[in-house]
Structure formats: structure tokens, C-alpha cells
């Protein structure tokens, strides 16, 4: 996606099918266990994994004005109330600030950050990034889910902070969030068709870039870009 305009430049879903023979293939397509007709880019709902650490970082920045002073010593894992979260490959990252934690994709540090966040504020930030909400899309899509409230356990928060737990998102939605960060916090309305021509080759309709919504401040976006 071109962040400054909203143009969708590429979209892929596997397994695929041949649209030229869809009539002949319809029976097996509709019974295919691999769901070839499902556009996984927009309709797939997956745990976001470490990409969600951007959301956790944003919430921490909003709650703690001194976020640049964050410090954590990673020993490859963190244990809290019986729940242990390991870093990938059991790697110990040592002393980290917030930028280091994101660069290292440190699960221990982000689990620690998750425990420091206000749950309702965390949910509000996620919803400002269009979780639990409609997405700008002309294609069928799955609504992303963020399930955190005052009753969410610390164990669940630790998992949520690193992109696991009950959180679900489509690749398309994660692209929208990333594009907004790249575009200074502003999400442009995505579109697939640049323009439409009639049989003479005359342009009868042209899509132009249009702001959809501001998801974060330009300062927040700039800091996330710096950390990325």
C-alpha cells in the first residue's frame, strides 16, 4: 500500500484459483478444505505476533511521558504470577530501553510493559487503530478483535502485549496501521482501481487520494518510525 495515497499496489492470498475456469472448478472450490476462495489478506484473522508491539509501544508512550527513560534488563524470560514468557531462541537481550526492546522484539520486556499499562486505555488505543471497528475496504474482510477490559488477567495482558492471546487481525488491517505510521499518523482511504475508462479509452472516473482518519499524532508516528 502506498502510504501517502492509499493505493493498494499488491495483494496476495494463497492458495489461489484460476478465475478463467471458476465455473468449471466451482464444485471443488466450494468444498476445498484449503478454502481457496477465502481472501486471507483481508478475511484471514490471525494473532498479530510481534507486529502488535507497535500498538503496545504507542500505548506506553501515551501513558508515560518519560517513555524515553524506560529501562529493562532482559534475562531471556519473565515470570509473573506463575506465567513465564520466553524471548525467541531464549536469547537474553540484557539492558534495553524502549527503542531497543522493539528492535530486539523482546518478549520479556514487552510483557513487562503490558503489566504497566492501564487496561481501559490500552483498549481505547487499540480501537483508535480500528480494532473492533469497521475498516475502509471495498472487499469482504474480517473485523479485527482486541479483547481487554478491567477483568483481563495479568497473564492475558502479558500475552496480549506481545501479540498473542485473544487478539486477532488481518494482514490488510496491519498494513493500514503501518501505512498510517509511515504517513505521519494519517490513514488514507485505500483503493484498488486508479481510474476507469470507457470503450474509447476516455477516463470516466478517477480515484483521488482521500484522508480516511487520523489514527495517531504526527509526533507519535515519527517516534514509532524512528524505533522501527
Regions found by a protein language model. Give the residues of each.
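Beta-lactam-recognizing serine transpeptidase/beta-lactamase-like catalytic domain environment
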Residues: 2-50, 55-228
Amino acid at each position: 500500500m502506498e502510504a501517502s495515497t492509499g493505493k493498494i499496489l499488491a495483494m496476495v492470498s494463497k492458495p489461489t484459483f484460476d478465475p478463467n475456469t471458476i465455473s468449471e472448478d466451482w464444485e471443488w472450490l466450494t468444498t476445498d478444505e484449503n478454502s481457496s476462495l477465502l481472501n486471507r489478506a483481508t478475511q484471514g484473522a490471525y494473532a498479530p505476533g510481534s507486529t502488535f508491539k507497535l500498538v503496545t509501544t504507542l500505548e506506553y508512550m501515551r501513558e508515560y511521558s518519560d517513555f524515553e527513560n524506560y529501562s529493562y534488563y532482559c534475562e531471556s524470560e519473565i515470570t509473573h504470577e506463575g506465567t513465564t514468557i520466553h524471548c525467541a531462541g531464549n536469547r537474553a537481550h540484557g539492558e534495553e530501553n524502549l527503542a531497543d526492546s522493539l528492535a530486539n522484539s523482546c518478549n520479556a520486556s514487552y510483557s513487562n510493559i503490558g503489566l504497566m499499562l492501564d487496561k481501559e486505555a490500552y483498549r481505547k488505543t487499540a480501537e483508535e487503530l480500528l480494532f473492533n471497528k469497521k475498516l475502509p475496504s471495498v472487499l469482504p474482510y474480517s473485523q479485527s478483535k482486541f479483547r481487554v477490559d478491567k477483568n483481563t488477567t495479568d497473564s492475558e495482558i502479558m500475552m496480549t502485549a506481545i501479540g498473542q492471546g485473544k487478539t486477532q487481525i488481518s494482514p490488510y488491517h496491519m498494513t493500514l496501521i503501518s501505512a498510517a505510521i509511515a504517513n505521519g499518523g494519517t490513514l488514507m482511504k485505500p483503493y484498488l482501481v486508479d481510474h476507469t475508462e470507457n470503450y474509447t479509452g476516455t477516463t470516466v472516473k478517477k480515484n483521488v487520494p482521500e484522508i480516511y482518519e487520523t489514527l495517531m499524532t504526527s509526533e507519535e508516528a515519527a517516534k514509532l518510525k524512528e524505533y522501527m
